UniProtKB/Swiss-Prot annotation:
Keyword tRNA-binding: no
Domain ATP-grasp: 110-315
Cofactor: Mg(2+); Mn(2+)
Protein name per UniProt: Phosphoribosylamine--glycine ligase
One of the GO biological process terms: purine nucleobase biosynthetic process
Annotated pathway: Purine metabolism; IMP biosynthesis via de novo pathway; N(1)-(5-phospho-D-ribosyl)glycinamide from 5-phospho-alpha-D-ribose 1-diphosphate: step 2/2
């Protein structure tokens, strides 16, 4: 096979992990990332085109003669990048605007689940506080309140009592998340443990692509506000083969078939956020891309070339593709965040030690970083670095990641010291 020119869209830790893995492929001749970050720059050419500039990205893909475009963030799918690439005949690993509604509209997904009988929490969708209140009357605390649209992982409130639930509804409908909160989805609270399951899809076929468990709260002990994710590990012991099989049969397969039947064939990553309830896995939410930071641990564990499977998915040829192979080891990712994250992260803090050689089993991915004058590395976002490690056991991987973190400094930065606690406790 001839070497490919690949365009990677995005600039976070997830995209650095994808770039790192794509660059290892013998099929990758040229890798261009837009807009990228200083970590990605080590393995790819960077172009200053934003992930939400669909027309600019199509022009860039045409200019470089891209054989494949790999989309990292959901924001690029929401503006129809995959549709615009399809119109000019460029294969894209990422969903159409309509298919991406599985992530970009929680109401769309809940209604889809209802139409196809998929296991999920009872719910209602509301545009005014009065009707939302009437539905809350029928539920018991705690209450789950979600903004309908994209809110960077922060649009979900678990309200312990009715007063907090009413306040969350008023807050969202009042414009806290802009148009994303113009509708709210209210759900019954599901009891159980959460885990994430990943599938790569080509519109008609789905291939299992690993599992992970993440930590959404900002601080140790699962305290503090929700974030985009403070750390993750893979594989999660709680997600047994039997549970994966059940989720595959009851959620993934009917979703891919249902989307195709409704004229919205799903291409790209289908990321199922699962609640492992006493009666089996139920859907919390779908995401239309690799999780961040879940992707980072999957890339460390992936023991086969990623490019053929991405290309096969983009071209509708997954049925003939080699399934991915996985390393036996456990992987962990710990997020180093800027002071004030998630509410008001302070940017500009100086980063030191991130470029050290930590050995083969530790990889540091850049998330929110930029280079100032004289090449100095500083924080440019809320989640700054992802320190990832492999180990024969989760304990070993954890030791390696935290050992590396001790030698990395970020002014005012913080990280959780308990990533992986659930799995270690279960042992």
């Amino acid at each position: 096979m001839e070497k490919l020119t690949i365009l990677l869209v995005g600039s976070g830790g997830r995209e650095h992990a994808l770039a790192w893995k794509i660059a290892q492929s013998p099929l990758c001749g040229r890798l261009v990332a837009a807009p990228g970050n200083p970590g990605i720059e080590a393995v790819a050419e960077l172009r200053a085109v934003k992930a939400t500039d669909a027309d600019g990205l199509v022009a860039l893909a045409q200019e470089i003669g891209a054989d494949l475009v790999v989309v990292g963030p959901e924001s690029a799918l929401e503006v129809g990048l995959a549709d615009k690439l399809a119109a000019v005949g460029i294969p894209c690993f990422g969903g159409s605007q309509r298919a991406a509604q599985l992530e970009t509209s929680k109401a769309f997904t809940k209604d889809f689940c209802q139409r196809h009988g998929l296991p999920t929490a009872a719910y209602g969708v509301f545009e005014d506080a009065a009707s939302a209140g009437a539905f809350l009357d029928t539920l018991e605390a705690p209450f789950v309140i979600k903004a309908d649209g994209l809110a960077a992982g922060k649009g979900v409130v678990i309200a312990p009592d009715r007063a907090a639930a009413d306040a969350a509804v008023v807050d969202m409908l009042g414009g806290r998340f802009g148009s994303a909160g113009a509708r709210v989805v209210i759900e019954e609270f599901m009891h159980g443990e959460e885990a994430s399951l990943f599938a790569v899809c080509d519109g008609k076929t789905a291939v299992l692509f690993g599992a992970a468990q993440d930590h959404k709260r900002a601080y140790d002990g699962d305290e503090g506000p929700n974030t985009g994710g403070m750390g993750t590990y893979s594989p999660p012991p709680v997600l047994t083969d039997a549970l994966i099989d059940q989720a595959w049969r009851e959620l993934i397969v009917p979703t891919v078939e249902g989307m195709a039947a409704e004229g919205n064939p799903y291409v790209g990553v289908l990321y199922a956020g699962l609640m492992l309830t006493p009666t089996g896995p139920k859907l919390v939410e779908y995401n239309a891309r690799f999780g961040d930071p879940e992707c980072q641990t999957l890339m460390l564990r992936l023991d086969s070339d990623i490019v053929p499977i991405l290309l096969a998915a983009a071209k509708g040829e997954l049925a003939n593709a080699e399934p991915p192979k996985w390393r036996e080891e456990a992987a962990i990712c710990v997020v180093l965040a800027a002071e004030g994250y998630p509410d008001a992260p302070k940017t500009g803090g100086r980063i030191q030690g991130a470029d050290a050689d930590f050995g083969d089993d530790v990889v540091v991915f850049h998330a929110g970083t930029t280079r100032e004058f004289e090449g100095r590395l500083v924080a440019s976002g809320g989640r700054v670095l992802n320190v990832c490690a492999l180990g024969a056991t989760l304990s070993e991987a954890r030791e390696a990641a935290y050992g590396a973190l001790e030698t990395i400094s970020l002014e005012g930065g913080f990280y959780r010291t308990d990533i992986g606690w659930r799995a270690l406790q279960q042992r």
